[in-house]
Amino acid sequence: MPEYPTEDTNASGKTSGSSPDDHTDDNAPSFFSCENLCIVQVPVSTGSLNGFSIGFVAVYMHLYEIFSGCSALESSGACSGNSKCTWIPNNSTCVWKDCNGAAGATTCKDGSGYNSLESGLFACSMIVGSMIGSIFAGKFLSKFGLKMSFIVSGVLGIVGSALIHVATRGSTLWVMCVGRFLMGLVLGLVCVASPMYVNENAHPKYRKTIGVLFQVFTTFGIMFAALLGLAIVKTPGHDKASGLLWRMQVFCSVSTALSALLLVLGLVVRKSKTSFAGGVDSAGEGVLDPNEYSVRQMLGPLAVGAVTAGTLQLTGINAVMNYAPEIMRNIGMDPMEGNSAVMSWNFVTALVAIPLVSRFTMRQLFLACSFMASCACLIMCGIPVYPGVASVDNRNIVATVGIAVFIAAFEFGVGSCFFVLAQDLFPRSFRPTGSSFVVMAQFIFNIMINLLYPITVEAISGGKGKSPEKGQSVSFIIFGIIGIICFVLQLRYLTPWEDGQGTSTSPTARCNAPTSPNNGEGEPATADMSPVEMSTPKHSGAA
């Protein structure tokens, strides 16, 4: 299988510093060729696992709420299938164990599902694991390589999935959290490794297209989880523990299968041609020195990367995903049906990014779409929802359209371009460290949103039990303002790393650096351009 060079070499064997995109498309294989599909399988498998793990939370919590509703169980066999329930032979009823046989069905229903603390632990366990995994991803990739990262991720994913199966059978929260934490470690590693593998090994003609597939299949995984959950709750017998338990196990088995697929991927995928000094694959030519640039030299790109992570998370994508089912409920839709509709729209809009990246630069898409998403948060999801601004009917319509616009803008450019930008902001030798930091930053912001959003909504709305419209409105106004601030900073400082620019790494210096119209030999100066800046096959619109 051919390996596409990332740098040109001259007669003396020294690198000329040219970008992969400087190579012509004459030797480009078909997109559906074997060698190209070998690269495509990486973002497809890793993105699907990432997406299903994200979509897992809302669906599983809903299924568990049904499963743990003891009063709905009508036989001793079904009741014994739930470790938190007990069967009362005298009146042939199933009650919550904490009821001690004295309480009625209404009290037992109060014990179904997770409480607020348990829900928080369940939701955040994977994100915390992802943050920790991304912290160590850079060192791990430099030492053991990309191929080994997929193998280790597959093994950890299988172990984590096995614990989730055990926790589902015994309704044990702490085992579930440990399993989700291990899955988080996997995702923290693959969110760095998968985009890096594509960046280092894909043919220049397809690098951006394949690069966005990680986000596209992340949205596919989220949608698949939502649709599978909808199918489960629409089948007869789903409200009985004896019938629901095996359905929940089937739902959990998707993560197991995807983790096994990741392990197989690690075993069969070819090694990346990029290796780092001090690593297990450091023999041979073209080895990169991970210590070529210090963190101090890279403070500028790292700061810009943190701002892009803020755009990804602090504009409220996770809050929108949580708020969307309630919006659908408000306009008369079933919550699970509404959730499936929103996640399907999320996937469809992500598909649009595939043709867009061949027409525009990553920078152009990211900037334009971040501005559009921020405006949607501020003007459509924020201000109109504030109590008294609009009637209830108009408010719901505008907010629903606003969420649709926000999701579309996010998937057109913000989500799809983020993981590619996390690579191209840094020189190749610094990418394990730089990309690891940027991905870690977005997980930190993710945790902040998951923890602070419900608290903020409740506090601004006047406390528990109050109508949430005021708190939701103010929250989305804040999201919009944060997005606008990030947009202004990125408009000034978001530029990809250019080979040969040396250590002038401050954002200001990089933005103000002059660009020569040619390379001294009458040819356009595309040699120093990163893939982020290659807007079209003719390189006609670098932003």
Curated annotation (Swiss-Prot):
Glycans are attached at residues 90-91. It comes from the Eukaryota. One of its GO terms (cellular component) is membrane. Residues 7-19, 503-519 have a biased composition (Polar residues). It is found in: Membrane. Residues 1-24, 503-543 are annotated as: Disordered. Disulfide bonds: none annotated. The keyword ATP-binding does not apply. GO terms for molecular function: hexose transmembrane transporter activity. It is a multi-pass membrane protein. It holds the Pfam family Sugar_tr. Residues 60-120, 169-172, 234-248, 322-337, 386-400, 458-470 are extracellular. Residues 1-38, 142-147, 194-212, 270-300, 359-364, 422-436, 492-543 are cytoplasmic. The chain crosses the membrane at residues 39-59, 121-141, 148-168, 173-193, 213-233, 249-269, 301-321, 338-358, 365-385, 401-421, 437-457, 471-491. Keywords: Glycoprotein, Membrane, Sugar transport, Transmembrane, Transmembrane helix, Transport. Belongs to the major facilitator superfamily. Sugar transporter (TC 2.A.1.1) family. Facilitative glucose transporter. Binds D-fructose and cytochalasin-B, but not D-galactose. NCBIfam families: SP. This is Glucose transporter HT1.
